[in-house]
Amino acid sequence: MPLDDRKKKILYAVITDYIMTAEPIGSRTIAKKYNIGLSSATIRNEMADLEEMGYLEQPHTSAGRIPSDKGYRFYVDSILRNYINNEPPISYNTREEIIAEFDEIVKKYAKILANITHHTTVAKMPKLNPDRIKRIQLIPVASNKMIFLVVTDTGIVKNYLLNLCQNVDRTIFEFLNNLLNEKIAGKNEKDVFEFLQQDLRHMLGEMVFIADELINTILLSLKQLQETDIYADGTSHILDFPEYKDLSKAKNFFNLLDNKSLLNEILEPEVDFIDVRIGSENKFEEMKDLSVIKTTYKINGRVVGTIGIIGPTRMDYRKLINEINVMTKELSNLLSNIYNDEI
């Protein structure tokens, strides 16, 4: 049975008030605070109907009502249907990020989102397999130290510090740069492994002393580029919500954030736009009292990761949907600009 305009107005009033106060609301309060144009008695009857239809709940013996997950879902769907981003773009100085690693850029944006929303944010860094190494660069920082820089064909940057057992002059660095880019750049994983295991030591000749460091670092970079990394920020914000003054609930929330494999599944993108999962809609028991708003970020149109906001079902969905949308658009634009030449 579809909701008529009267029921919609009352449902939205209950949700709006509960988001702000965390307290059940009664018909008299709605009549006084919200310009619905209905008497308290009429509102009371409509609220009883909404409860019977599953959109509202009556906690314990309270005279007031609170939204159910079904009520939140109706509210969120109406937001997403009518969603227009009227907020100005977030101004952000990208100069520092351009020299940062990919995952550090994403972490910084997740931190900003947590600070803006006062909610816990989680970010999923990409699993890049089967991406290939596009470029390797060895940068000397001392005669016995160098930075090993890896750039993938999606522009992801990883760097490692190598400590060498002997001093190496710059001509050797140039030789190694040319050799590794010739033999590894653009090759698939199988060819890279074969080169490392069968050919590298022979090609290094008198420089074989550097072989173990190079082989171990290249293998480590390949392994890490195939792993999904999960980052969380603003974890303490959950304690600002009255629902989580209960220490056992707070403990369960922090245990959830420690479960990286579970967060990985929670952040798995299911739609190409903003995805909202409310309370009981989540398939994991640990998320039954929580909602997650998640969306993907991209490099030149290609999805490379996910960012989400996790909090109580009593969250300001309209505000948070707008903020995560603006932030991920900014992040996608920045990443696309930085890595445009690398793809």
Curated annotation (Swiss-Prot):
Protein family according to the UniProt entry: Belongs to the HrcA family.
Stored InterPro entries: GAF-like_dom_sf, HrcA, HrcA_C, WH-like_DNA-bd_sf, WH_DNA-bd_sf, WHTH_transcript_rep_HrcA_IDD
Alphabetical list of NCBIfam families matching this protein: hrcA
Name of the protein in question: Heat-inducible transcription repressor HrcA
GO biological process, any: negative regulation of DNA-templated transcription
Swiss-Prot/TrEMBL keywords: Repressor, Stress response, Transcription, Transcription regulation
Keyword Membrane appears in the UniProt entry: no
Keyword Transcription regulation: yes
Superkingdom as given in the UniProt entry: Bacteria
Biological role stated in the UniProt entry: Negative regulator of class I heat shock genes (grpE-dnaK-dnaJ and groELS operons). Prevents heat-shock induction of these operons.
SUPFAM superfamilies reported in the protein's UniProt record: GAF domain-like, Winged helix' DNA-binding domain
Organism (species): Thermoanaerobacter sp. (strain X514)
HAMAP family named among the record's database cross-references: HrcA
A single GO molecular function term of this UniProt record: DNA binding
